[in-house]
Amino acid sequence: MALTPLRVAGVPEHFNLPWHLGIENGAFRKVGIELEWQTVPQGTGAMCDLLRKGETDLAILVTDGAVRDILNGNPSRIVSSYVDSPLNWGVYVGVGTALHKPEDLVGLPFAISRYNSGSHLIAMNYARSLGWMPKKENFIVVNDLFGAEERMRTDEPMAFLWEVATTSPWAEQGLFRKVDEFRPPWPCFMVVATEQALKEKGAEVHRALAVVRQQAALLKTRADAAELIAQRQVISLPAAKEWLREVRWNMDGAVNNDALFNVATALRELGLIDGSPTKEELVRRLVV
């Protein structure tokens, strides 16, 4: 059977382990798909660019980043929820700073991977939860987690938000100090496909999603799942166990339309999208 190539982009984090397991055990090939994985450490903003340029067929994006970019013209659609549990963002500062509590961060810069990335959008939501609205000069682009480490070693007064388990080695080694956690009230990841990929490879997209759901379900039942995650992601076993206990991969492809509407409302209040579409109009523009 001839294999259909399918390009998928995602961050190098434990959430995406089911994709890698499916590649390694040949599960995608068994359904006629040659899955080509592209790791994108810069995150959602960079993957939105790949989708716009047609350089990937699918991408695993944080929900608010997916909603914002599609509403701002990205020729792609949400095809499925991927992780239904909310993303737990750690709020970090340099260990040599005098910053110790959320209130200390009001008015300070945020380090972000890039503009319109997950770290950028969530920093704006977090700042709003503290009662202030950042401006462009409140953001420092650091490209990725390692760039954040380098910048925060200077002990400049700034904050950086990234997923808690991923950043746990930095916190445990005393490279970052965590002063808060922030969980937005919506699912953390969506699977987004280009309209061209849906037109040309729609059946393969849905077969691939069926495979990855099966791999996620199998991973959740493995006795050694936490050990595997800790080894593959180079995080501590306690951090892996805590993350595995909380994560909920989507198992039926359903998209929470109410959650998408809440995301769009938050983005509009932050000035990141225009217009006030109804929930029905919003879903029609976002979801296939």
Language-model features, listed with the residues they occupy:
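Secondary-structure end/capping motifs
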Residues: 200-274
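Residue-level preference for well-ordered alpha-helical positions
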Residues: 127-128, 171, 230, 268
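Short, glycine-/small- and polar/acidic-enriched structural segments
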Residues: 2-132, 139-142, 158-164, 175-183
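Pocket-lining segment of extracytoplasmic ligand-binding domains
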Residues: 146-229
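Solvent-exposed, acidic/flexible segments
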Residues: 12, 44, 116, 120, ...
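Conserved C-terminal helix/tail region of periplasmic/extracytoplasmic solute-binding proteins
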Residues: 268-288
